[in-house]
Amino acid sequence: FDFSFLPQPPQEGLMGPRGPPGASGAPGPQGFQGPAGEPGEPGQTGPAGARGPGPPGKAGEGVVGPQGARGFPGTPGLPGFKGEPGAPGENGTPGQTGARGLPGERGRVGAPGPAGSRGSDGSVGPVGPAGPIGSAGPPGFPGAPGPKGELGPVGNTGPGPAGPRGEQGLPGVSGPVGPPGNPGANGLTGAKGAAGLPGVAGAPGLPGPRTGARGLVGEPGPAGSKGESGGKGEPGSAGPQGPPGSSGEEGKRGPSGESGSTGPTGPPGLRGGPGSRGLPGADGRAGVIGPAGARGASGPAGVRGPSGDTGRPGEPGLMGARGLPGSPGNVGPAGKEGPAGLPGIDGRPGPIGPAGARGEAGNIGFPGPKGPAGDPGKGEKGHAGLAGNRGAPGPDGNNGAQGPPGLQGVQGG
């Protein structure tokens, strides 16, 4: 800094004769108090003059002494008082909307992410319908023949002739019902039941507490598929004019866009005089995003500006919806067929009747009880599925708050 405009401290020059007092100058600015000077030598007492008023002396001529050495630099002055804010200037006419920049290059496809952890076992599927009735078992073995009856004693022959042959006797009373037979063999395993309906998607879970440490930024995933075009929204109201942004990076030349429709010519505004600089206002609220306009013609390549500040990382997203239940496991193999039951106990022999005609085949017996369920399948669980496509990019973040104004600089000389 150049402090030559500040008053310099007195230097130790040669003491010349005292000159006449000069004319009073204009009052200068109040300077800082300089260092105390060295005490001068005491003067010698001159001879006493004659009493009485003497003639007025002539004005002496001052002799210019040699220039003293350069003094030490003084301390910097205090900063001046801040002036009152000026009146706000009139808003200028809005400038024309610049041409839309060319799209950037497509990002590289990121490396596939690491294999996910093994998922939890799926829930047990619904019980399938009952299988068809098994086929009839083999016919039973014929019972053992009963013991031969004892012969009665021969009666005495009567004196008369032999009578006619008697009529056939009534059939004997049926014997008591025998004990129930042994249970039949286990039936065959029923057919595989149809797959159950997919479960209803659960409601999205509440976001968990953000207590964990911020995770590392993962590698970029593959580009997501293009979403469906949304309907044209209503035009939003014009937001307040924001501060001018930094110059964007130089884009690459793309294909010529469709010419935009010419808007109505507005009335020319009056040119206002330059107003004094006012205080920075508070940040305005972001306006509603209007519909995307038609792509205008490509403008000339602009000068590449400095890179903007890096934005803050986004907040973690909400937890996704719960996935659908997994498919039921494969049906296990059929269980082993049980051993054949023991033959029943022979019934008590009844009275021997006459041999009747051969009867018709009997009805098929009732099906045996259902066999126990087979062992669950022992197949290995399938591998985890591939990672899904990358989601659509989120909306652009809002501009950050404007920083506080800097300190006022020291006024130069």
Curated annotation (Swiss-Prot):
Protein name: Collagen alpha-2(I) chain
Residue list for modification 5-hydroxylysine: 82
GO terms of biological process kind: extracellular matrix organization
Tissue and organ distribution: Expressed in bones.
Protein family (similarity comment): Belongs to the fibrillar collagen family.
Subunit structure: Trimers of one alpha 2(I) and two alpha 1(I) chains. Interacts (via C-terminus) with TMEM131 (via PapD-L domain); the interaction is direct and is involved in assembly and TRAPPIII ER-to-Golgi transport complex-dependent secretion of collagen.
A GO molecular-function annotation: extracellular matrix structural constituent conferring tensile strength
Processing after translation: Prolines at the third position of the tripeptide repeating unit (G-X-Y) are hydroxylated in some or all of the chains.
Glycoprotein recorded as keyword: yes
Organism in which the protein naturally occurs: Scelidotherium sp. (strain SLP-2019)
Region (Disordered): 1-413
Role, per record: Type I collagen is a member of group I collagen (fibrillar forming collagen).
Keyword vocabulary terms for this entry: Extinct organism protein, Extracellular matrix, Glycoprotein, Hydroxylation, Secreted
Signal peptide (from-to): none
The keyword Plastid belongs to this UniProt entry's keyword annotation: no
